[in-house]
C-alpha cells in the first residue's frame, strides 16, 4: 500500500502541528504530532501518540550501549545537546491531544520506526514524516506564499528514501561479511559510516575495530582501504540521505 498525501488532515494546537492520516477503506488511522524547533531548524515527533509503548522502548534503548552511541553521534552531527534531542509535553487537560515524548525526527526514521511491527504503518509513517519535512523545507516563490511542494517533488523524495532502504537491505559488513539487516541482535542492525570512504561496515564490527586500534596505539584507518578516518556515524542506511 502506497502513501497518499491526499489522505492527510492538518491542524495545530499552540506550537504543535497535528497530522492525521485517514484511510477508512483500509482501516488505517495514524496521528503524528510534530514540533518544529526554529533555532535548530529541525523537527521533533511525538512517539507516544503513535503508540504509547514506543516511548518506553525508546527510554530503554537510550540506556543501552547502541542507544548511547547513537545519541552521542547524532548530537555531534547536528550540534544539538543530547538533552535537547528529546522534549516532553505533560499530560493535562489542555494538552490531552498533544502530550507525550517528542524525539528528533532522525531517531524516528532510523530507529523507532523499526519497532513498529505493521509494515504498512511503517511505510505510511515514513512517508508522512518525509512529506511534512519536504513541505516545510520548501520556500514558495510567490508573494503570498500560497504555493506548496508539488506531488512530483514529494514522490521523488519518497522514492529516494525507498531506494536507499532497498539497497541497504542487501549490504554486507566488510569485516564479518554478514548482511547488516539480517544480524541476530537488533542493536547490531546499523551501519557504521566512515567520513573518509564509502566502505560498508556494521556498527558493531567497526566500533570494535576502532576501539582495538585505539588500545594498541594504531591510527584510525579503514579496515579495507586504510584511509584514515575521524568519525563513525551510526546509521540505519548504508549512506547518509540528504
Curated annotation (Swiss-Prot):
Does Acetylation appear among the keywords?
A: no
Task: Report the EC code(s) recorded for this entry.
Answer: 2.3.2.27
Q: Its Gene Ontology biological processes?
A: protein polyubiquitination; symbiont-mediated perturbation of host apoptosis; symbiont-mediated perturbation of host ubiquitin-like protein modification
Renumbered zinc finger spans (RING-type): 173-226
Its keywords, alphabetically, are: Host cytoplasm, Host-virus interaction, Metal-binding, Modulation of host cell apoptosis by virus, Modulation of host ubiquitin pathway by viral E3 ligase, Modulation of host ubiquitin pathway by virus, Transferase, Ubl conjugation pathway, Zinc, Zinc-finger
Task: Give the reaction(s) catalysed.
Answer: S-ubiquitinyl-[E2 ubiquitin-conjugating enzyme]-L-cysteine + [acceptor protein]-L-lysine = [E2 ubiquitin-conjugating enzyme]-L-cysteine + N(6)-ubiquitinyl-[acceptor protein]-L-lysine
Q: Which GO cellular component does the record give, naming just one? A: host cell cytoplasm
Q: Give the Gene Ontology MF terms in alphabetical order.
A: acid-amino acid ligase activity; ubiquitin protein ligase activity; zinc ion binding
InterPro entries, per this entry?
E3_ubiquitin-prot_ligase_p28 (IPR016398), KilA/APSES_HTH (IPR018004), KilA_N (IPR017880), MKRN-like (IPR045072), Znf_RING (IPR001841), Znf_RING/FYVE/PHD (IPR013083), Znf_RING_CS (IPR017907)
Where, per UniProt, does this protein localize?
A: Host cytoplasm
Query: What sort of enzyme, by top EC class, is this?
Result: transferase
Q: Where is the KilA-N domain?
A: 21-131
What Pfam families is this protein classified in?
KilA-N, zf-RING_2
Q: Briefly, what is this protein's role?
A: RING-finger E3 ubiquitin ligase which catalyzes the formation of both 'Lys-48'- and 'Lys-63'-linked polyubiquitin chains. Plays an important role in virulence by acting as an anti-apoptotic factor.
Q: Which family does it belong to?
A: Belongs to the orthopoxvirus OPG021 family.
Q: Which PANTHER family match?
A: IP09428P-RELATED, MAKORIN-RELATED
Protein name as catalogued: Host range factor p28
